[in-house]
Amino acid sequence: MAAATERTDELVREYLLFRGFTAALKQLDAEIKADREKGFRVDKIVEQLQQFVQSYDLAALRDYWGYLDRRLFSRLEDMYRPTVNKLKTSLYRYYLVHTVQTGRNDKAQEFFLKQASELQNQAEWKDWFVLPFLPAPDSNPTFATYFSRQWADTFIVSLHNFLSVLFQCMPVPVILNLEAECHRSSLIQEENESLRHKLFALQAESSRMKKEELEVEEAVVHHKLPAYVANMDRLGDSELDMTCSQRSTAHSLQSRGGFLSSLLSQSKKGPARPAQPSGASPTQTGSVLLGKKEPANHQSAKGKEGTASSKDGKSHFSGLVAGESSSLQQRQKRLQEHGKERRELLSKGTSQVQSAEKKADISTSEPEPCSEPQADQAETSTKMPASSTESVGVRQEQPFIVLSQEEYGEHHSSIMYCRVDCSGRRVASLDVDGVIKVWSFNPIMQTKASSISKSPLLSLEWATKRDRLLLLGSGVGTVRLYDTEAKKNLCEISIDEDMPRILSLACSPSGASFVCSAAAQSPISHMDFSVVTSGGKSMNQVPGKLLLWDTKTMKQQLQFSLEPEPIAINCTAFNHNGNLLVTGAADGIVRLFDMQQHECAMSWKAHDGEVYSVEFSYDENTVYSIGEDGKFIQWNIHKSGLKISEYALPSEATGPFVLSGYSGYKQVQFPRGRLFAFDSEGNYMLTCSSTGGVIFKLNGEDKVLESCLSLGGHRAPVVTVDWSTAMDCGTCLTASMDGKIKLTTLLAQKS
């Protein structure tokens, strides 16, 4: 409701300004500024009550609660009146406990003097009048419960939940329902689009079935990743070649039918062996599907006429018998696969027949999550191994209360980016299939805009001033400006034909410009995966450029100098005022740029391998970086290369991220989005893990990394995170390889 109210206020302002009602507009702004209901923001109302308690302002506390009672609680049915009275009693006791804990017994006595006439006839208050005169009330059995931290936290959460439910259930004017109506219309449009895609998919399947009925060859099956996904790989155009070899006494033929791959997923399918080892490096993005060898002893396919069995017992695939009976059996199995393939086609959101055929080739062996379901309730994490120079501890007292955890599940493939806008109201998410979703989560999750890119997308960034705009970097050398409210592209600019991969985008806090990292295609298209998984460093450091563009004119302002040689920049981040820019590159070097002089102020070798993610600290005197070597390091920006602290993180926090399935395949994704994020004061850090986000406490004095809270909730590895503190309650985003995004709302426990 708060989001709808805020949006309606903006619409009313726009209307009054359009009509020239300036006096009414000024009056509206004045009343909104003095709004005691805080725009139906529950967190703001609770914060206001806490401020009155902490300032010992009893009169203001009584007056504000009375206003809420008249304005909101009076609308409730009589059956809820006891609940309101209990909350009021708890609020007064919360005030009294605070006065005693802070040594202000005079305020406690003042409370009973002013409230005596109201409270003396209430049975629940008869024991409380002696409170100011007890020497140690926190040890008294009557009052000990109320002096515990648990009771105070429970009261705040109960009050927060009560107000939230009240705002969701109260009747609202018609104008506030406009957003819901728009959302309903959007859902209908999406449903129509989905049905249209389904029609195209069925037509494609029908055409393919007619062609395959004419083919009787059997086969070596050649699998390739679609170029759409392959171009996103950081090392280059990774492709997956699967060779099916058949040793039969009769013959060995090749099949041109792409749909034969669906037959191999049945009981007659043997293990796949890659023709060429393939791998990837974080200079290119995407998920790489790799074949995993299985035991090679399989029986040959059965047919009514019988087939010749494999002589050596070691062939990877057994033969399929050609003949009428075998063809009939194949067609029956194809029909069993049609439902699954159509769902896969619809989830990818394409209406092209060629694209549908490509996606069907890889949909038959979709990896399944190997981990058990994680409990939704947050729990304390175990101790994390540290490097030889730093230690990692376990924090016993949790600094946050988990208010809720929700799931956004409209993506159907691995997430690359997931970012909250500056206002903390909307989220933009991008998956490896080029599907962009813009959605809100307050008060309920709603998809505001959805788009499917024809060209592969590699990067995403919110504009800072006009937070309705998104910057989208592609794999074909272009950057698009997308309006999330109008749901259309405002413009598209070409960066560099020789540097087609836009690896990173960062918008200046002033909103006047943005930096763009462009990189060339990798000259190496295949790499041995064993090198990558064993921790080997990237051998493919491609050249790149770092460019500054004007946001208004969408013209290039300058190109930064990258020393010692031009290199692909993987990650970029501005400080709070945009005067400094920190970057992490494929050569392992962190560079700090002076944006006023437009030159590199300092650079240093930070990691053995590529730099995956960089961020400024809260005080901006240091920067943090995560690299291919699995280290999380803090650097002093006032002295080049001065290391303040270093921690060794597990591979599940730094990547590459691996999702294994029972089908024998592995899906591997290299880091692309943000790998860590800080809270509002920079004391806590959110990172990735195999089952959800993990929060650590950063302790600069003791140089330890304390594991505080495990958010959990994921069945697949988390590949990118974000932490929004624009609202009073922190919002943690964790996105995983199965396309699920968890949104966890945290309430900080003030010490």
Swiss-Prot record:
Positions in coiled-coil regions: 188-212
InterPro entries for the chain: Apc4-like_WD40_dom, ARMC9_CTLH-like_dom, WD40/YVTN_repeat-like_dom_sf, WD40_repeat_dom_sf, WD40_rpt, WDR91
GO molecular function, one term: phosphatidylinositol 3-kinase regulator activity
Spans of repeat WD: 410-449, 452-492, 497-559, 564-603, 606-645, 668-706, 713-751
Keyword Repeat: yes
Keyword Repeat: yes
Chain intervals with Polar residues compositional bias: 278-287, 377-391
Keyword terms: Coiled coil, Endosome, Membrane, Repeat, WD repeat
Membrane topology, record value: Peripheral membrane protein
Record function comment: Functions as a negative regulator of the PI3 kinase/PI3K activity associated with endosomal membranes. By modifying the phosphatidylinositol 3-phosphate/PtdInsP3 content of endosomal membranes may regulate endosome fusion, recycling, sorting and early to late endosome transport.
Entry's family note: Belongs to the WD repeat WDR91 family.
Name of this protein: WD repeat-containing protein 91
